[in-house]
């Protein structure tokens, strides 16, 4: 059982608990098996052999400001449109710390974004801190259930007289997410504390860099591959959701993503 008593704890203190890092480890382990997970699967197994000791060591590195994120390695996956999708391969420690940070961000942002779940937002829905123990081991709720719900809502819209469907895709979305804007949204809308955001910003800037290009750094882009990234991308889009919801009062249309 992994539980986290948040009473009288700052978000940074929540982040640095062994319980949170164990939860991060379990969530990496329970994530869907895909190419990205295959790459770090052996690291998961080895780290788990001495899990408590390795987590304690990792937390101490962060507490004592010894921890430094490392530049990612990039691999490129062909897409159907003849373009490529870049995957950012992080070290396992970086990946674990990223997930541990995102656990805290997810728990502390949930009450703000939850009213949009199953209403406007149907993908990448996180399990809240109030979920049962087994569900909490998974970062996201079952995508199959959410896909079913999305199709049900779409069908209802057509049955209610809406005739036209427009689909949009943001080109190179992950690569163009501005770190400063992301941190402003996390701070102002979701009340994430400054020291969490400082570490997140430092990590994202480093991971955006490519190990093959020693001097290149960027203030935009989040790593594709880790399960933390689509959740942060959803929080980044939250402003769009709220603005479109305002337009919905003036124009008769339905919006979902």
Indicate where each model-derived feature is located.
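Non-catalytic, polymerase-adjacent accessory regions of viral genome-replication enzymes
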Residues: 2-80
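Catalytic micro-motifs at enzyme active sites that drive phosphoryl/nucleotidyl and oxygen chemistry
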Residues: 63, 72-76, 84-90, 148-158, ...
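Active-site-proximal segment of RNA-dependent polymerases
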Residues: 107-167, 172-178
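Conserved polymerase palm-domain catalytic core
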Residues: 151-257
């Amino acid at each position: 059982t992994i539980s986290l008593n948040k009473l009288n704890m700052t978000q940074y203190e929540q982040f640095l608990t062994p319980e949170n890092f164990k939860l991060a480890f379990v969530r990496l382990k329970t994530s869907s098996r895909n190419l990205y997970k295959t790459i770090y699967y052996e690291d998961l197994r080895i780290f788990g052999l001495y899990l408590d000791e390795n987590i304690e060591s990792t937390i101490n590195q962060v507490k004592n400001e010894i921890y430094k994120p490392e530049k990612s390695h990039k691999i490129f996956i062909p897409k159907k449109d003849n373009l490529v999708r870049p995957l950012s391969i992080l070290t396992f420690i970086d990946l674990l710390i990223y997930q541990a940070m995102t656990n805290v961000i997810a728990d502390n942002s949930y009450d703000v974004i939850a009213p949009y779940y199953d209403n406007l937002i149907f993908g990448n829905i996180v399990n809240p801190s109030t979920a049962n123990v087994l569900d909490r081991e998974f970062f996201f709720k079952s995508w199959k259930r959410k896909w079913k719900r999305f199709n049900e809502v779409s069908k209802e819209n057509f049955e209610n007289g809406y005739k036209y469907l427009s689909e949009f895709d943001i080109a190179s979305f992950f690569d163009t997410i501005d770190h400063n804007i992301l941190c402003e949204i996390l701070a102002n809308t979701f009340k994430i504390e400054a020291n969490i955001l400082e570490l997140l910003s430092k990590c994202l800037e480093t991971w955006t860099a490519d190990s093959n290009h020693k001097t290149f750094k960027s203030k935009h882009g989040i790593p594709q591959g880790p399960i933390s990234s689509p959740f942060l991308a959803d929080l980044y889009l939250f402003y769009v959701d709220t603005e479109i919801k305002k337009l919905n009062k003036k124009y008769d249309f339905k919006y979902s993503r």
